[in-house]
Design a protein with these regions (language model features):
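Acidic, low-complexity cytosolic segments
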Residues: 1-31, 38-149
Length: 149
């Protein structure tokens, strides 16, 4: 079981999704995923049903990788982001706060510097919305079985 210590209002979730879509479109990214530290999908862009299973996997695996690397980094140094390079696509994962992460999946033609630059503006916008959700302090329990893979 896991505890969720935030609750997003419908209008906040719509605003988050809108901003993720704008970020995705501004850089021609393939996928943008906002997740929490428990691997739960908060929102994603493009917001199309066919992308939801992929976004859920990115959220779950992304949070696990960030958690594992975080434990290793206590030995070396502290970082707030990770970059993964594949044959055709790259992924940049950035910690927005101690609770939320943003993953950007993009083609090699998109410069990493542009992703980082545009991510800074998005991070500031999202952090305000997410801090409001955390401030409400509503906790609920989620069973692992409830997470759809």
């Amino acid at each position: 079981m896991d505890m969720i210590s935030y609750r997003l209002k419908e209008q906040e979730l719509e605003e988050i999704t809108k901003r993720l879509q704008e970020y995705k479109n501004s850089l021609l990214l393939d996928l943008v995923v906002l997740m929490d530290d428990g691997g739960r999908l908060v929102s994603f862009a493009p917001y199309v049903d066919s992308y939801k299973p992929i976004a859920q996997r990115v959220a779950l695996v992304g949070a696990a990788v960030v958690g594992a690397v975080d434990q290793l980094e206590h030995v070396i140094s502290s970082k707030k982001s990770m970059f993964f390079s594949g044959q055709e696509k790259n992924m940049y994962v950035h910690m927005l706060s101690h609770k939320f992460m943003l993953a950007s999946v993009f083609n090699h033609k998109v410069p990493l510097g542009s992703v980082k630059l545009f991510k800074e503006k998005l991070s500031r916008e999202l952090t305000t919305l997410l801090e409001n959700a955390l401030a409400r302090g509503e906790s609920r329990v989620v069973r692992f079985e409830d997470l759809a893979l």
